[in-house]
Amino acid sequence: MSNESKCPFHQTAGGGTTNRDWWPDQLNLRILHQHSSKSSPDPDFDYAKAFKSLDFQALKKDLTALMTDSQDWWPADFGHYGPLFIRMAWHSAGTYRIGDGRGGAGSGQQRFAPLNSWPDNVSLDKARRLLWPIKQKYGNKISWADLIVLTGNVALESMGFKTFGFSGGRADVWEPDEDVYWGSEKVWLGGDTRYGKDQVKAQPPGQGDLVAEPAKHGEEQNRDLSAERNLENPLAAVQMGLIYVNPEGPEGNPDPVASGKDIRETFGRMAMNDEETVALIAGGHAFGKTHGAGPADNVGPEPEAAGLEMQGLGWHNTFGSGKGGDTITSGLEVTWTSTPTRWSNEYLNNLFDFEWELTKSPAGAHQWRPKEGKGAGTVPDAHDPGKKHAPSMLTSDLALRFDPIYAPIARRFKDNPEQLADAFARAWYKLIHRDMGPLARYLGPEMPNEELLWQDPLPKADPSTISEQDIATLKSRILASGLSVGELVSTAWASASTFRGSDKRGGANGARLRLAPQKDWAANQGVDKVLAALEKIRGEFNNGGKKVSLADLIVLAGTAAVEKAAKDAGYSGSVGFRPGRVDASQEQTDVESFAVLEPLADGFRNFTKARYSVKAEKLLLDKAQLLTLTAPELTVLIGGLRVLGANHGGSNLGVFTDKPGTLSNDFFRNLLDMSVEWKPTSADNETFEGRDRKTGQVKWSGSRVDLVFGSHAQLRALSEVYGSSDGGDKFVRDFVAAWQKVMELDRFDLK
């Protein structure tokens, strides 16, 4: 008999075949409950308060000292960790994409899977370990999210570059994001499903969510493999596990012009225009090198697949010493300039002054060297002072020279170094702050004074806000305006629900509902009538000497309507309202930047702009997650908005009540009524009729979004709470709380 004791358990908790295995297409509500207080070691911790007590200059001094404090266990290239830390910060922020606002540096996700194990992030595990003594020293006064980005900024400064500034305020989370769709490929560096006829056009929430742009939706369904590359939305990388593009060229094909197209697509999806893109590449590649000392088969598994003894590190390298001059990261062995630890314009000089020929790295990857042996002996070795090299380039570098749009920009920067320095400083600042939201969230002594259009600026608030008496007066005028409860509620929702918790953009503050592009969105059809009436009320009120913003008035109108609807249902009490919103101007609103906030579907209003391959209930879940809602909040809001008559275009889908405009729990009571039998009324199962089982008479009509609250087991369980005989009071209380939450999602000035 074996001496090894037999374990009484064949499987531990959480193992075995899961519901997801049985029903992979099941609506996954887990994405609404990620990052709960239960995952945090200190649920009541106030990071902004802690950050304000940080000795910021002392931290920067320690970071600067670290740059040249080379460690034997991971020696610094050229004796300076700056380039490594720039890459760390870049790859943290560079996961951001404008399509859904997800990704980015805002919560320190680079510490967790899958990002900590992406092929493009090889060796960044070492970068974060180099930072640990400093993180340990300053503790919770600096988050990992802020520290990663700040270290990249300090790295630039330590090598002679003047940055545009830095702002803190990125609080850490304690578990991986589950809502981000990184692609459908099953192998690292795969790109088979994000391009071509076999492209997966939608993923259920929990595996990530995809909402294809309507303009491209038909192309995505009908194109074949030979068609022009059309990257799946909302992805902003060409292969699984890359930040942007394959540096060897598309699919490893060393074609600089084709690479330029990939660069434009991916950087554009990260909100960078052509000039910003050139500046970022030219500025970033002024420093450091890539690593491809030997074949990739010398590299061990990534951190998430490595053994316990690796203690969270990965990619153990058996080539030579496995570090220093034997490092293998991308497989490319490129050093761009003779001054890899000092800011200069040499990258662009080399790019245009040399003619380039294709070669291969020691690892066998495509890269470029100067023709005729030019430049030999001008570039230092990263670890051996006795060696010299020629400069080298990536295929993606040559794109800046041969792409017809990038080339003139790059030449201008080459001839005007001061323009490159300014453009890189601004683009870098945008890169590392793009997902932080409004300026009210920015912290620290290095916040620039200049407001930038991509920050969605707002005018300063008037410190003299309207009084409680003013609020009561305005409510009375709104309710006497002739506008219905449904119209007022729907308009307030249209304004506030543009908010995205992913990148903290959108929301009611600014009243951009009245500006381009929002005023022309299909989802906002009919709000112009409400806005005109509210503008009249506002003008009359403001003529009396006091001032109310339209942004406040839009929210107040919805709030007054909810109060009236609750009162009509027999419930007393008020709905919270806190003034202080301001009205943005069209000049403060970047139309192109705001276009990505347009709702292609909003299940809360039973709206879809077009027919999509992804199911309506999954689009609803995606929207709810971006609104930071829990499953109970999602449920109660749907039930309340339906009976209030807030549907797009006044549709009766899901209005399961004979007294619309009254805040009752009728939606749930009638949805759960077993005397009603439901059947689809459309071939695509998008709409349904509910008929009396005995008489066959049609009682209700509903959408997929409505019926999922009776079909999905978890949502039905929640619906039963609100649909019970004693659920009315709770329904109203919970609806009011969820309503106020959505109305104030962007009020960072209050938090």
Swiss-Prot record:
It comes from the Bacteria. The active site is at H91 (proton acceptor). Pfam families: peroxidase (PF00141). One of its GO terms (cellular component) is cytosol. Its EC number is 1.11.1.21. GO terms for biological process: cellular response to hydrogen peroxide; hydrogen peroxide catabolic process. Residues 214-227 have a biased composition (Basic and acidic residues). GO terms for molecular function: catalase activity; heme binding; metal ion binding. It catalyses: H2O2 + AH2 = A + 2 H2O; 2 H2O2 = O2 + 2 H2O. The keyword Iron applies. Its cofactor is heme b. It is an enzyme of class 1 (oxidoreductase). The keyword Transferase does not apply. Residues 1-21, 195-227, 365-387 are annotated as: Disordered. Heme b binds at H285. InterPro entries: Catalase_peroxidase, Haem_peroxidase, Haem_peroxidase_sf, Peroxidases_AS, Peroxidases_heam-ligand_BS. There is a cross-link at Y244-M270 (Tryptophyl-tyrosyl-methioninium (Tyr-Met) (with W-90)). Homodimer or homotetramer. Bifunctional enzyme with both catalase and broad-spectrum peroxidase activity. Belongs to the peroxidase family. Peroxidase/catalase subfamily. This is Catalase-peroxidase. It comes from Pseudomonas putida (strain ATCC 700007 / DSM 6899 / JCM 31910 / BCRC 17059 / LMG 24140 / F1). The lineage of its organism: Bacteria, Pseudomonadati, Pseudomonadota, Gammaproteobacteria, Pseudomonadales.
